[in-house]
Amino acid sequence: MKVTLIAILTCAAVLVLHTTAAEELEAESQLMEVGMPDTELAAVDEERLFECSVSCEIEKEGNKDCKKKKCIGGWKCKFNMCVKV
């Protein structure tokens, strides 16, 4: 009886680990596919552009010199826009 229970639990654990590994591989393969449109990255780019220009416009309306928002992650603020360095 104990041996059967141990065997069943072992098989269940192996099945769970195998399923998890398969899901990770599938996710990696989708990320590595060439030619897929990178819409999420494009959305982030547009967001950065918007945030940078809006922050600069707010400072201009307050009669202050425009101190451009510091962009992070390989980006810099130039001409009221975040651009990739």
Curated annotation (Swiss-Prot):
Stated family: Belongs to the neurotoxin 12 (Hwtx-2) family. 02 (Hwtx-2) subfamily.
Cellular component, GO, one term: extracellular region
Pfam families: Toxin_20 (PF08089)
Species of origin: Cyriopagopus hainanus
Record-given protein name: U4-theraphotoxin-Hhn1h
Predominant place of localization: secreted
InterPro entries (UniProt xref): Hwtx-2-like
Record GO terms (molecular function): toxin activity
Keyword rRNA-binding carried by entry: no
Keyword presence, Disulfide bond: yes
Localization of this protein: Secreted
Disulfide bridge map: C52-C66, C56-C77, C71-C82
Keywords: Disulfide bond, Neurotoxin, Postsynaptic neurotoxin, Secreted, Signal, Toxin
Tissue: Expressed by the venom gland.
Function: Postsynaptic neurotoxin.
Residues of the signal peptide: 1-22
